[in-house]
């Protein structure tokens, strides 16, 4: 009798399990309009943990490296490239039939230590830095030619006030380092899409500067397919009207738009904090970490509303939006737990710490059905 009862219960549960497995995911529905991506860290690209693998492959059809393709990791010494993790990222994507985007070729932060100085520690000349930049871009892009759909060629070269960042690339080469980087990347893989990527893109001064840059690159004959709006957003920012105006401005400038590093910081920020400048670091303060045991109902509602607001905007411009990438797989592995304040518990992504899709995802999917 007990076996019969267990058998009957099993039959009753089968349809429920089947329904759960057949629920449409983001990649199933949103993927009809644009690529749905996530950033992978070095643990995730090597893992065999089925929970992590399924969280990635069930929900996303595109991946990008969180760190392993950045200069200091992939090219730590002038005559040595470390392809170990980057190759595995591409292999993981190929195994699971996912698209790969490359991040990033030229960035002032996490650049190789040797890039800007000679053996005596003196600043290199313009000619030397151009040559080093050329070889770095050429070797990295050619290695993954035909395997990577597109590259963030230059990352974060413009400040929030619209001026050029005074990076070593800018100081040594001048503003044309951006144009040269796009030329070198295109020469290395003529079929790869090329992007300019930056944060705080809803700020009007920054928006205008990026539009100007796009037009200058196009006038110079450079290939630039899209602007990447990183979208490291928060529970009370950005201003949605400004955010949408930037989308419209970039489209009007003749390029597509990609949302390349989407997350929603649910924690209060230090008073002087702004943007997504990775060099900003602050001491831990428990007042800045209010949700150690989970979001309150009010905070969860705000989280849901923010994500729904962004995806409602994206829905309006699907003809010009080619990719939306969330910056991380799950809350537990998100960079937001350690930046800009270390040791916090944040909830900025669409998959929770148990690798379960959050309820708001169903509402996002409904927007596109």
Curated annotation (Swiss-Prot):
Top-level EC class: hydrolase
* EC number(s) given by UniProt: 3.2.1.8
Report the GO molecular function annotations.
endo-1,4-beta-xylanase activity
Query: What Pfam families does the database record attribute to this sequence?
Result: Glyco_hydro_10
Q: GH10 domain location, by residue?
A: 21-367
A biological-process GO annotation: xylan catabolic process
Q: Which reaction is this enzyme known to catalyze?
A: Endohydrolysis of (1->4)-beta-D-xylosidic linkages in xylans
Query: According to its UniProt record, which residues of this chain constitute the active site?
Result: 156, 261
Leader sequence residues: 1-20
User: What are the entry keywords?
Assistant: Carbohydrate metabolism, Glycosidase, Hydrolase, Polysaccharide degradation, Signal, Xylan degradation
Superkingdom, natural source: Bacteria
Report the pathway entry. Glycan degradation; xylan degradation
- Segments crossing the lipid bilayer: none
The entry sums up its family as follows:
Belongs to the glycosyl hydrolase 10 (cellulase F) family.
Query: Can you name this protein?
Result: Endo-1,4-beta-xylanase A
Which organism is this protein's natural source?
A: Xylanibacter ruminicola
């Amino acid at each position: 009798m007990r076996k019969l009862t267990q058998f009957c219960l099993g039959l009753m549960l089968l349809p429920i399990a089947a329904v759960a497995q057949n629920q449409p995911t983001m990649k199933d529905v949103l993927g009809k309009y644009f690529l749905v991506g996530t950033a992978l860290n070095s643990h995730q690209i090597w893992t065999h943990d089925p929970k992590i693998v399924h969280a990635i492959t069930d929900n996303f059809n595109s991946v990008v490296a969180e760190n392993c393709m950045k200069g200091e990791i992939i090219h730590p010494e002038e005559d040595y490239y470390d392809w170990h993790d980057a190759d595995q990222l591409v292999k993981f994507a190929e195994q699971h039939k996912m698209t790969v985007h490359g991040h990033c070729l030229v960035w002032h932060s996490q650049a190789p230590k040797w890039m800007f100085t000679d053996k005596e520690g003196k600043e290199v000349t313009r000619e030397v830095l151009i040559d080093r930049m050329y070889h770095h871009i050429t070797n990295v892009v050619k290695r993954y030619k035909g395997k990577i759909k597109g590259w963030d060629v230059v990352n974060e070269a413009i400040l929030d006030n619209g001026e050029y960042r005074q990076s070593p690339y800018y100081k040594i080469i001048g503003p044309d380092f951006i144009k040269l980087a796009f030329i070198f990347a295109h020469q290395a893989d003529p079929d790869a899409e090329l992007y300019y990527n930056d944060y705080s893109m809803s700020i009007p001064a920054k928006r205008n500067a990026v539009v100007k840059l796009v037009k200058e690159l196009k006038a110079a004959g450079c290939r630039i397919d899209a602007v990447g709006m990183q979208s490291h957003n928060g529970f009370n920012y950005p201003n949605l009207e400004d955010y949408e105006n930037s989308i419209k401005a970039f489209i009007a400038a003749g390029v597509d738009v990609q949302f390349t590093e989407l997350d929603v910081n649910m924690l209060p920020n230090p008073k002087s904090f702004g943007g997504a400048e990775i060099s900003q670091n602050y001491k831990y303060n428990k007042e800045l970490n209010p949700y150690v045991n989970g979001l309150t109902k009010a905070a969860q509602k705000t989280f849901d509303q923010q994500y729904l607001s962004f995806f409602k905007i994206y829905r309006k411009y699907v003809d010009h939006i080619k990719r939306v990438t969330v910056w991380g797989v799950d809350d537990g592995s998100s960079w937001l737990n350690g930046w800009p304040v270390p040791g916090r518990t944040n909830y900025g992504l669409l998959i929770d710490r148990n690798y379960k899709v959050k309820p708001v995802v169903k509402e996002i999917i409904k927007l596109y059905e």
